[in-house]
Amino acid sequence: MNQTYGRLVSRAAIAATAMASALLLIKIFAWWYTGSVSILAALVDSLVDIAASLTNLLVVRYSLQPADDEHTFGHGKAESLAALAQSMFISGSALFLFLTSIQNLIKPTPMNDPGVGIGVTVIALICTIILVTFQRWVVRKTQSQAVRADMLHYQSDVMMNGAILIALGLSWYGWHRADALFALGIGIYILYSALRMGYEAVQSLLDRALPDAERQEIIDIVTSWPGVSGAHDLRTRQSGPTRFIQIHLEMEDNLPLVQAHFVADQVEQAILQRFPGSDVIIHQDPCSVVPREGRKFELV
């Protein structure tokens, strides 16, 4: 699983970096030629795209390194750090757009030949839609937090390029403040995306539990298994591609140790079949030692 995960996530990061680099060169020319503040917004965003995607590429490769003596649970948390770094990059670009947009609202400047800007923006829009489609497929296959953060960023780019097209069209017909107004709106949306991305990264670093639906699946697997009378103390988290699952099984007091171990192994394999690559720890408890109030399964 890790090989497939690493290959897909690396390809997504390389594709994002290559596309952002190509679009940056095109947008530099378009901004120089037209003087559009909306194109400047897209240019700044491409610079952030490159920094974020390069960070993703380097961090993802590090996060896929196997566990060692100093990092016994692996390096998967590096993905969350990459997502947090992206949120800071994006917040910085949003603040820059705020300042530039306000300046151009106060003193609007007519742009040169909006048609060039429209052509460049259409190219950027098509390329970004293709990239987001590929990233969404990778996220569906890997559940990578780093690629998901990158995808959210490029999804905002799709909206941004659409808004830029409208702004350039309005400027073409003489409404010069439209350029700055749309750039300001884009900045607000980018900042919102950055804050949401940062929140998700922090939650992962704080070892947030797996989604309720996944935990319920684990409960259903465990409690329906022959030989298991009940279960309690389910604890879960995720680091990179690896889910960490801990649970206590309740078994009959007189069940031989060998048989209890066999049942626990079967339960572990069933969980791994549903969640491949997980790190599963199962503890067996005799029913008599489990407090009565603890016998009703609770999510922890």
Swiss-Prot record:
Family: Belongs to the cation diffusion facilitator (CDF) transporter (TC 2.A.4) family. FieF subfamily.
Listed InterPro entries: Cation_efflux (IPR002524), Cation_efflux_CTD (IPR027470), Cation_efflux_CTD_sf (IPR036837), Cation_efflux_FieF (IPR023783), Cation_efflux_TMD_sf (IPR027469), CDF_Transporter (IPR050291)
Record flagged with keyword Ion transport: yes
Annotated membrane topology: Multi-pass membrane protein
Keywords: Cell inner membrane, Cell membrane, Ion transport, Iron, Iron transport, Membrane, Metal-binding, Transmembrane, Transmembrane helix, Transport, Zinc, Zinc transport
GO CC annotations, alphabetized: plasma membrane
Listed GO biological process terms: intracellular zinc ion homeostasis
Pfam families: Cation_efflux, ZT_dimer
Record protein name field: Cation-efflux pump FieF
Functional summary from the UniProt entry: Divalent metal cation transporter which exports Zn(2+), Cd(2+) and possibly Fe(2+). May be involved in zinc and iron detoxification by efflux.
Higher taxonomy: Bacteria, Pseudomonadati, Pseudomonadota, Gammaproteobacteria, Enterobacterales
UniProt keyword Glycoprotein present: no
Membrane-spanning ranges: 24-44, 82-102, 114-134, 156-176, 178-198
Binding site for Zn(2+): 45, 49, 153, 157
Gene assigned in the entry: fieF
Subcellular location: Cell inner membrane
Subunit structure and binding partners: Homodimer.
Lineage top rank: taxon: Bacteria
Known catalytic reactions: Zn(2+)(in) + H(+)(out) = Zn(2+)(out) + H(+)(in); Cd(2+)(in) + H(+)(out) = Cd(2+)(out) + H(+)(in); Fe(2+)(in) + H(+)(out) = Fe(2+)(out) + H(+)(in)
GO molecular function: cadmium ion transmembrane transporter activity; ferrous iron transmembrane transporter activity; metal ion binding; zinc efflux antiporter activity
